[in-house]
């Protein structure tokens, strides 16, 4: 296992690009807001996009009966993963970062660890 380094940094451009891509789904024209209400076509499109990024990271993906998506990076040891996250659905006039940053920051951490060859002790979700 690689060790943590003070040189370990997230890719802010990749994170910003993902935030922008997700914010386009349900974007409210003329504003920086978006409307991606739960259980709408926009919500499904947003979840599908996030799932595609999880697949690119080879995460183990589960979707429950109401559409909650969890992607897990395996750790060195079995047991419950350390979880981070939020939501990607919005209220009718939600902001582009509302919930999205909490989900995408977790993916960025996983991608950064993978790129550095670091496998965590516990899984990350």
Q: Language-model segments: which ranges?
A:
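Catalytic-core environment of secreted peptidases
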Residues: 57, 65, 69-97, 106
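N-terminal capping segment at the start of a domain
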Residues: 2-40
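Short coil/turn segments at secondary-structure boundaries
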Residues: 38-41, 91-101
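N-terminal glycine-rich anion-binding loops that anchor highly charged ligand groups
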Residues: 17-30, 46, 73, 78-82
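Alpha-helical metal-binding/catalytic segments enriched in His/Glu/Asp
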Residues: 84, 96-125
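A non-catalytic alpha/beta surface segment that caps or lines the substrate-entry region
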Residues: 28-73
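General structural feature for long, well-ordered alpha-helical segments within catalytic domains
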Residues: 11-18, 42, 46-50, 109, ...
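Generic secondary-structure signature for well-ordered alpha-helical cores
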Residues: 3, 20-27, 55-59, 112-119
